[in-house]
Amino acid sequence: MIRQRKIELLAPAKNLECGIAAVDHGADAIYIGAPRFGARAAAGNSLEDIAELVRYAHVYNVRIYVTVNTILKDEELKDTEKMIWDLYRAGVDALIVQDMGLLELNLPPIPLHASTQMDNRTSQKVRFLAEAGFRQVVLARELSLVEIENIHHACPDVPLEVFVHGALCVSYSGQCYVSQACFGRSANRGECAQFCRLAFDMVDADGKSIVRNKHLLSLKDLNQSEELEQLLDAGASSLKIEGRLKDVSYVKNVTAYYRQKLDTIFKRRKEYIRASSGEVKLEFKPQLDKSFSRGFTNYFLFDRNKDIFSFDTPKSLGEEMGTVKEIRGNYLTVAGIKSFNNGDGVCFLDETGKLQGFRINRVENNKLFPQEMPRIKPRTILYRNFDQEFERLMSRKSAERKIAVILKLAENNRGFTLSLTDEDDNSVSVVLEREKERARTPQEDNLRTQLGKLGNTPFEASDIVIDWSDNWFIPASMLAELRRKGIEKLLEVRRINYRQEIYKLPRTHHAFPVNELTYLGNVMNADAVSFYRNHGVQRIAPAYEKAPAEEAVLMFCKHCLRYSMGWCPSWHKVRSPYREPYYLVSSDNRRFRLEFDCKNCQMKVYAEK
């Protein structure tokens, strides 16, 4: 018998609306921001909304994870503890956390997941976290397929969560301090200022210009939709879509796309099964290039990759549509590979490489009539970053999710019994006490029609069985009421039978992988100090946010500008024509020195005084 492993598609939710959309479009689990301390200051949610999402999702066995993944001040811990108890009582399935100080609090028996903000890159770190009580570990985005597989082999009992889609941080998560250093806004406190999306000049040690006014730290967006099966075989069990600040259209489209890809894999690979219930029926065709993206990359999944950055713009280009043939007074003609719609948003890169755009007023064959004529030249490539027709589809009901149920109507001594059994083997029965009377006309077709009317419920009839000894008559109103009571009872049983994992954190004292923590340990409060001391760490420096370290590395990047320019001594065997060190210079003339750590194959960014 094949041993089956449950695979979780984990979707983001900015708010309740996005969370419900994620359920409807195929998510097995959803992560959503806590009322406070959720690593996205702009994406907090009320306890009431979270409780409503829990109630909706659990019908489909969809799990709800709440992010509490920031580092915390001492004076915030008491409120955080209370909030966690409130989330537990609301039925939340797990918390995604960063601050080890939380493990020293009086927490309810709720599972904890180790956020990628903990910088989870090694099997030693993953094993430590699992032994400390973490039930799932979110791996660093920079890991290769081989590295993920090695971690899985070393820690086969630890569920591994990997990002498969969405925006990429150029620095290792949890190891970026540049926003705090430059703007007083800590990424580890949920207030990232998006420094990596800014434009920079790059100069050498002599002040010679290497590159001017480019977004040199801005990466493309992650897209590993073609590598899902390889990720599963490597040991990933939770596949995560980034996007807790994205709108509902993005959540619908991207979740549905990955749902379809995974379901196709599951049909062939019986050792993998989905982690929730209900079949998703879509009213649109999911297409990733219809949603926000800076272009796509599979990042470092197969080691270093030259096609990971988006130097021209940090904004969404969208889908390539064709090229400009000629420009006339109030329109331009296009040699198109796809058709445009009235109201579409179109963008292009001008002669200087800057992103420009316009809105289409109307389309006539291959003629585009912009609302305002852009300054554009023939042979310019056009992209559509807003598809009016697609967004119209996304703005209305675009999917439904139905749990299969078998309905059986049988007679009994007092009347009739309607039994309902769903795809997860939950079963209920309701009784109609009524003296039997024979019908004058055949009833079976009508009975099947009436019992199958499950439209505005989470259920869909996969089979309807009529087990009668005679052609009995039941008024349509009574049959409808019997069906309604049966559905309500089945819903109640599904909620009762849902198993919220109860897990009490163990008190542990096993050794942390290192015995000294610099500011990179992100230790912000006394409880975090206590945790690390209890696990063998002897020297503990405070978090950068608490005491900025001198000469601190502000960013640790797998993305390397020397490699991107074609001057990597390991890969290209070419000597740079410019003298190091190189510097990034921002528009307000701040300078940042680049250091290339070839031993660890990474680039470090320092602020110059």
What would you call each of these model-derived segments?
Residues 1-25, 29-39, 53-54, 60-88, ...:
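Surface-exposed amphipathic alpha-helical tracts and adjacent flexible/coil segments at the periphery
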Residues 42-51:
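Aromatic- and glycine-enriched glycan-recognition loops and surfaces
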Residues 93:
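Short, conserved active-site loop motifs that form the nucleotide-linked donor/cofactor pocket
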Residues 103-108:
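Short active-site loop/helix that positions an aromatic residue
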Residues 115-116, 120:
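Ser/Thr-centric signal marking residues that sit
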Residues 121-125:
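Short, glycine/polar-rich helix-capping loops at beta-to-alpha or helix-loop-helix junctions
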